[in-house]
Amino acid sequence: MSCILNPSHSISKKMISLKRYTLLIILLSACILSTAQKRLKTPLAFVPADSVVLWGESYNDLRGMALRVNKTLQARAVKPVGKAYKKALKAWKEETLPTATLTGACEKGLSERMLRNALLIEQAGGLFLESADSRFMDLSERVLWGDLMREVISPSPVSFEKHTASQALVDATGMIYATSGEDLWVNLFTNSTTHVLSDELNIIVDQMTGMPLEGRVKIRLTGYSRGRFHVRLHVRIPGWAVGRFEPKEKYVFSNDAKVDGVETGAASPITKTPTFYINGRESLTSVVENGYFVIDRTWNSGDEVMVEFPMLPYFVKEVGKDSASVAACHLFRGVLEYVPQQSDKDFRLSPNVGLKETESEDGVPLYEIKDAKENVVTFAPYISVW
């Protein structure tokens, strides 16, 4: 039997590969070149938390998990830093970033760490409104799901620390979306529905996702009035999805992970780009601004954007730390750090270690690694290990 190839189909596949490669180059170039946060002429505005309805299960629901701790919590609005921009940016660079860890704002005791985490969320939000720079949201995402949510869902009794963390989660619901004119920013990924109402916009935005465990995000735009409407949609591309980890002076990516004996290599988050679809068709445009994928178009009510972020394991190395150190290398998947379920102070993780992928009874991805004595060590998300 002979097989006749469709030339146009072959060319189409090549064009898609070329477009994806072009997008990868743009994203990586942005990672290298974006060093200074440029201030906007007019700051953005967050969509108020009261306009955002969150739904879902477990730690996907920022507000819901926080209200389990204290049902009376109310979101505090995060505002632009205004005239204090230069001072706030200096404090961010000289005080906040140098102390930032893989999951939180600092390595201090629990009380101070929760306070610093909450302050970081407020700082990041105010500076983001002045710059529209995704790096502020990258670190916010890491702190929210790396340390704050962990404290909120931990089995420990209600305490000052748990209350502080819960308040920060509630405040962050007012940072999920931002607007300016006909521009809409999607900053954080969580199941939500919001009514975006301004002089230029009057739309319903639905977001459906399995983040932070799954990499698929669906965004639906519905107009209140009849006919079509124009929106310039900005969807954040997380730093971890393109090989960027802040602060870069302290941490670097490594894509040497081997899962079930197969090197992730070219399919790692560093070399595999996020994929965007509009109404089921892949978008091959390559407009990226300040770490956001931009879709500028006139929409029909009910149009959908779907994003697939690479959710493969990767390693983060601490700059300047001896490779023989137990804490020199850390395992991540998406925004979540993975740690041993059983505490083992002598276990040393290295980038060339073999990973076996498995999952828990409730479907959470896990990784098994053999130690020097051939004992199996199971790694689970830090957020769920106490």
Predicted features and spans:
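N-terminal secretory signal peptides that target proteins for export/translocation
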Residues: M1-L18
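Sec-dependent signal peptide recognition
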Residues: K19-I25
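Hydrophobic h-region of N-terminal signal peptides that target proteins for export
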Residues: L27-T35
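C-terminal beta-rich recognition modules with glycine/proline-rich loops and embedded aromatic residues
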Residues: R39-L54, M137-G223, F245-Y277, E282-V288, ...
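Long, well-ordered core segments of solenoidal/helical folds
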Residues: A49-V52, G56, N60, A84-T103, ...
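Contiguous mid-protein beta-loop-alpha structural module that forms a pocket-lining wall or clamp
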Residues: G109-E112, I121-M137, V143, D147
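Extended extracellular/luminal ectodomain segments enriched in beta-structured repeat modules
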Residues: S225-L233
